[in-house]
Amino acid sequence: MLDIKLIREQPDEVKRQLARCGVDGAIIDQVLAFDEQRRRLIYEVETRKAERNAVSKQIGAMKDQAERQAKIEAMRRLGDEIAELDRQLAAVEEQQRAAMLEIRNLPHPDVPDGVDEHDNVVVYQEGEERQLPFPARPHWELGEALGILDFERGVKLAGSRFYVMRGAGARLQRAVIQWLLDLHLRQGYQEIYTPFVVKESVLWASGQLPKFRDNLYRDEESGLWLVPTAEVPLTGLYADEILEASQLPIYHAAYTPCFRKEQLSAGRDVRGIKRGHQFDKVEMYMFVKPEESYQALEKLRRDAEECARLLGLPFRTKLLCTADLGFGSTKTYDIEVWAPGVGEWLEVSSCSNVEAFQARRANIRYRPEPGAKPEFVHTLNGSGLGLPRTIIAIMENYQQEDGSILIPEVLRPYMGGMERIVNEAA
């Protein structure tokens, strides 16, 4: 959520920045109209309360019963007026907050302007679009031939966009998760295990609501929601708390399954595990002082890149343009790995600085020094990494001509020393 003071003091600049992201600035006018109503109602409430206090003092000094009764009646009328004004004020404040929650974050000056994802800028690359010395097979062919991916039974269990991993495939999935968490521990993150369901308020705090409501799974009976990313519960950890400056920075890493209902077009990514309604991800999350947040973003980016590097995957880092920037982000790097079987660069991490956007929604503050007025922290989030596409890249880059898959060296200790995935039934 943006700072209302910024909107009041620089409405034209806010509109200009929103326009960079293709957002109509009319909502800023709505917020300001609600703000004007709110301030007028506050003034009227305070004026009526002052009148009531004055009448109350007069009553105490009155001896004439008729005059006293008239003043008591005047106080009652003022009380009714105050109650009605308070009701109107609460309604306007709710309307203003609802409008504020619809406004995306503003892009950082470094973010390039653009009209779509083709305007994203590659800022770093290690490795090329690897060409194998034999025809590269896509991961779904490899997985089915090796008996480690079972799409038919995934559909049987849960419907389209679900799959089952078997044997060495399931072990590979588990190995990647554990290795990533251990790596982030060495990078300075504290591992966190959170619920995989959250209250609705936590989704509002993280910025998932209202924008992504149609993509989320909700249990109607309990009112709890399945997490679409560990970013959501990690944001909510310190909601409505005041941290001390000495506690910052806080670096957390968490694994969760992620659940999303997003509707996918029939002709796009219909094969394989690239897009599904349930997937695993390890998330990195930071709470930092405002003046340190862009330095922290570079650490987040380096830590995500290190994951791809140690796995031996060709990768590149893109700075997202304004058209591709997420709702809450001011600046985002995407890390993509090359997958020769599908012939694509696949996004495995998105590292974003959201500044105080989430902290303001979640009311997460810190004291710059003892006794100082609390200020909002800055928060950052980054995938470290998203598993389906990481698994795709491992399978397709490490495939052998005989259809087996070599296991990256860093993962072998997590798989009991296994060096190669072969068809166990062969």
Swiss-Prot record:
User: What subcellular compartments does it reside in?
Assistant: Cytoplasm
Q: Which InterPro entries match?
A: aa-tRNA-synt_IIb, aa-tRNA-synth_II, aa-tRNA-synth_II/BPL/LPL, Ser-tRNA-ligase_type_1, Ser-tRNA-synth_1_N, SerRS_1_N_sf, SerRS_core, tRNA-bd_arm
Q: Name one GO biological process term.
A: seryl-tRNA aminoacylation
The EC number(s) given in the record are 6.1.1.11
Q: List, alphabetically, the Gene3D superfamilies matched.
A: Bira Bifunctional Protein, Domain 2, Serine-tRNA synthetase, tRNA binding domain
Metabolic or biological pathway: Aminoacyl-tRNA biosynthesis; selenocysteinyl-tRNA(Sec) biosynthesis; L-seryl-tRNA(Sec) from L-serine and tRNA(Sec): step 1/1
PROSITE patterns for this protein: AA_TRNA_LIGASE_II
| Assembly mode | Homodimer. The tRNA molecule binds across the dimer.
Role: Catalyzes the attachment of serine to tRNA(Ser). Is also able to aminoacylate tRNA(Sec) with serine, to form the misacylated tRNA L-seryl-tRNA(Sec), which will be further converted into selenocysteinyl-tRNA(Sec).
Which protein are we looking at? Serine--tRNA ligase
The organism encoding this protein is Chloroflexus aggregans (strain MD-66 / DSM 9485)
